[in-house]
């Protein structure tokens, strides 16, 4: 059991090590922090922390550094995360507020998060398990070419140009537009794909061929939207922190290239009392990321969590500030999507 002062000692060790990248000794703790006790007393506290495997001694230093277990206790004991500065909040508001559609806002979000935290930023596209067809539009481009537009309730837009035999007129497109929206509006993507496959059977025989082509194209668009997607930015930030990885940084770079692995990791993370999920060091080993920490938060457009965003970096990171950035960006993104 770690005492209250022991927790305070662990806290300053984490903060000082994150700030300096140098092992922390009892003398520097006494000099820099107002504990009101001797260096010998702090050494005893540090010895107890080491027995609990919360800190460890690098082989060339008399100071101590936090372990994965120490970082975990530090994060779990955070009373609150450090608030963003007014300038940071304004940057989020301005940069994301200029976006024009879902693709643009998510691309801006991942770049902004990488800049705010100096870590690798991750933004998952809205969860397909909760996506539904909002609207389908058919636009005549010429006498034989039609633009099909699929819009989901999560803001994703998929467009295709299709060639139709014959000469489909505006009346035909109006009828098909109405039939399609009545058939699949509000349906989940999987259910919508199944429904579209039978839609051409319900039109007049003379229009069936064109209807079949339109329905088939829309099925392809629905299935394309069922693919999970993840945006990344800031991979160069890992290179600047290469010293924080005891081994080679290559396995980490290889792991973040595997979107399936990252999506599985995000799917297993749950938020704590601060609204942010934190997975540290060895907790990420099954995903090939045992030397990293991952911080994520969910975002939504109408109350339910649609997807997650976050950052990935070395275990030696400023958890409080990065958690605040992740949480603030997720909250602003949710508000932005709800307004659209």
Curated annotation (Swiss-Prot):
One of its GO terms (biological process) is negative regulation of DNA-templated transcription. The keyword Transcription regulation applies. The keyword Repressor applies. GO terms for molecular function: DNA binding. Keywords: Repressor, Stress response, Transcription, Transcription regulation. It holds the Pfam family HrcA. Belongs to the HrcA family. Negative regulator of class I heat shock genes (grpE-dnaK-dnaJ and groELS operons). Prevents heat-shock induction of these operons. This is Heat-inducible transcription repressor HrcA. It comes from Clavibacter michiganensis subsp. michiganensis (strain NCPPB 382). The gene is hrcA.
């Amino acid at each position: 059991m770690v005492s209250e002062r022991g927790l305070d000692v662990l806290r300053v060790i984490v903060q000082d090590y994150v700030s300096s990248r140098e092992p922390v000794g009892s003398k520097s703790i006494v000099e820099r922090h107002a504990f009101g006790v001797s260096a010998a007393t702090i050494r005893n506290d540090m010895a107890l922390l080491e027995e609990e495997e919360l800190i460890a001694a690098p082989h060339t230093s008399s100071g101590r550094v936090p372990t994965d277990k120490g970082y975990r206790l530090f994060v779990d004991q955070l009373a609150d995360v450090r608030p963003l500065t007014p300038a940071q909040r304004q940057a989020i508001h301005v940069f994301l507020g200029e976006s024009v559609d879902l693709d643009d806002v998510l691309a801006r979000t991942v770049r902004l998060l990488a800049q705010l935290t100096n870590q690798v930023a991750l933004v998952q596209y809205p969860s397909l398990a909760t996506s539904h067809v909002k609207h389908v539009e058919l636009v005549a481009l010429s006498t034989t070419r039609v633009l099909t537009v699929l819009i989901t309730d999560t803001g994703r837009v998929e467009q295709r140009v299709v060639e139709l035999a014959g000469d489909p007129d505006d009346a035909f497109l109006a009828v098909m537009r109405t039939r399609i929206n009545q058939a699949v509006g509000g349906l989940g993507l999987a259910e919508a794909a199944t429904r579209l496959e039978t839609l051409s059977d319900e039109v007049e025989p003379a229009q069936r061929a064109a209807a079949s082509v339109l329905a088939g194209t829309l099925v392809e668009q629905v299935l394309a939207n069922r693919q999970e997607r993840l945006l990344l930015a800031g991979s160069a930030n890992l290179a600047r922190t290469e010293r924080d990885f005891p081994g080679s940084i290559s396995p980490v770079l290889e792991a973040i290239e595997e979107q399936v692995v990252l999506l599985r990791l995000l799917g297993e993370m749950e938020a704590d009392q601060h609204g942010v999920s934190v997975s540290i060091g060895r907790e990420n080993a099954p995903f090939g990321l045992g030397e990293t920490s991952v911080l994520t938060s969910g975002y939504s457009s109408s109350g339910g969590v649609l997807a997650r965003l976050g950052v990935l970096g070395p275990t030696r990171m400023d958890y409080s500030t990065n958690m605040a950035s992740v949480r603030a960006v997720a909250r602003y993104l949710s508000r932005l999507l709800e307004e659209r």
